[in-house]
Amino acid sequence: MSEIPGDLKFLKSHEWARVESDGRVTVGISDHAQGLLGDLVYVELPGVGDTVQVGNGAAVVESVKAASDVYSPVSGTVVEVNSALSDKPETINEDAYGEGWIFVVEIDDKEQLNDLLDPDDYAELLEDDDH
């Protein structure tokens, strides 16, 4: 398993959130999640301007094995999507924490970030899943 970046926060459902310098939040799925799904073949992105709610489905990733909702770790408005994933969904498999980001949210309430798991807690969750 790859190293979990220290600047990310996580949902228990394996989505990550990274607060950018402008206060917006970039969202993707964890390296663990992409590994469970296998080779991704399709990503259904939210629309720019869509309102997303914390814990609700905002996107869908599909692999040859399964389709999985991508839940938003924060509430707000989608301000950017990674349209490159339409042509190359496997980017998530190759770089889940970098080029494989899925969408960016203008967050409504920064306090929501405090409810997310930090990298150590997320690593602990993964260890518990393995037992």
Swiss-Prot record:
Residues modified to N6-lipoyllysine = K65
Kindly indicate whether the keyword RNA-binding belongs to this entry.
no
Q: Does the keyword Plastid apply?
A: no
Q: Which InterPro entries match?
A: 2-oxoA_DH_lipoyl-BS (IPR003016), Biotin_lipoyl (IPR000089), GCV_H (IPR002930), GCV_H/Fam206 (IPR033753), GCV_H_sub (IPR017453), Single_hybrid_motif (IPR011053)
Q: Which residues form the Lipoyl-binding domain?
A: 24-106
Q: Which domain of life is it from?
A: Bacteria
Spans traversing the lipid bilayer = none
Q: Which GO terms describe its biological process?
A: glycine decarboxylation via glycine cleavage system
A GO CC annotation given for this chain: glycine cleavage complex
List the PANTHER family hit by this protein, alphabetically. Answer: GLYCINE CLEAVAGE SYSTEM H PROTEIN, GLYCINE CLEAVAGE SYSTEM H PROTEIN-RELATED
Family statement: Belongs to the GcvH family.
Q: What is annotated about its quaternary structure and interactions? A: The glycine cleavage system is composed of four proteins: P, T, L and H.
Q: What is this protein called?
A: Glycine cleavage system H protein
Q: Which organism is it from?
A: Xanthomonas euvesicatoria pv. vesicatoria (strain 85-10)
